[in-house]
A protein has these predicted regions:
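Extracellular/luminal ectodomains of metazoan preproproteins built from arrays
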Residues: 1-11
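Leucine-rich repeat
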Residues: 21, 27-30, 42, 50-54, 66, 74-79, 87, 90-91, ...
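Conserved hydrophobic beta-strand positions in leucine-rich repeat
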Residues: 13, 34-36, 55-60, 79-84, ...
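Tandem-repeat architecture and repeat-register "anchor" residues
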Residues: 26, 47, 71, 96, ...
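Consensus "Asn ladder" position of solenoid repeat domains
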Residues: 18, 39, 63, 87-88, ...
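LRR N-terminal entry segment and analogous cap-like coil->beta motifs
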Residues: 9-46, 52-56
Length: 191
């Protein structure tokens, strides 16, 4: 167990509020849950999580993340929940940021400064059920959600943005959309 963290017998490592600027090197490959929230992590690359293939839950909220290198999460095919909220310097996400996350159910990107969503950003997430994009700087809702058509249930949070326009086909194939939250935006009409 890394010295600045707490570990449990259930393969959970709690490194929240540990003052980390980089990932501790002593994280066991068998780790199932890793909490790195409220630290000073800035950039994650393709090697950051490569040995943590059993990870189911990952908390990276409240850090100083500025960029997520495409392929960062590629080895995490078992990951079910990913928390990236409150990374206020995170403004852009590459189209392949979430490639490899085949079992991801919940993705929290709220309270970042994301202003644009690439149309293919969520196309690698066939199991996604909950997507939180609340309190960002989005002004436009593109066709990025079209690829989420196979979902059994989707909760989509787009509240507290600056959205004034929504693509006519933004929600076209979301037949299983369960909940859509668009409050506190600049919308004058809906498609």
């Amino acid at each position: 167990c890394p010295s600045m963290c707490k570990c449990t017998p259930e393969e959970t490592i709690l490194c929240n509020r540990a003052g980390l600027k980089t990932l501790p090197g002593e994280i066991a490959a068998s780790t199932i849950s890793l909490n790195l929230s409220n630290n000073y992590l800035r950039i994650l690359n393709i090697n950051t999580f490569r040995n943590l293939t059993f990870l189911h839950s990952l908390w990276l909220d409240g850090n100083n993340l500025t960029f997520l290198t495409p392929g960062t999460f590629h080895a995490l095919s078992r990951l079910q929940e990913l928390h990236l909220s409150r990374n206020s310097r995170l403004t852009y996400l590459h189209a392949n940021t979430f490639r490899g996350l085949l079992n991801l159910i919940s993705l929290d990107l709220s309270h970042c400064n994301i202003f644009e969503i690439h149309p293919l950003l969520f196309s690698h997430l066939p199991s996604l059920e909950s997507l939180d994009l609340a309190s960002n700087n989005m002004r436009y809702v593109p066709q990025a959600f079209r690829n989420l058509s196979s979902l059994t249930r989707l909760n989509l949070y787009l509240n507290n943005n600056q959205i004034s326009s929504i693509s006519d086909s933004a929600f076209l194939y979301l037949n299983k959309l369960h909940f859509l939250h668009l409050s506190r935006n600049n919308l004058s009409s809906l498609p």
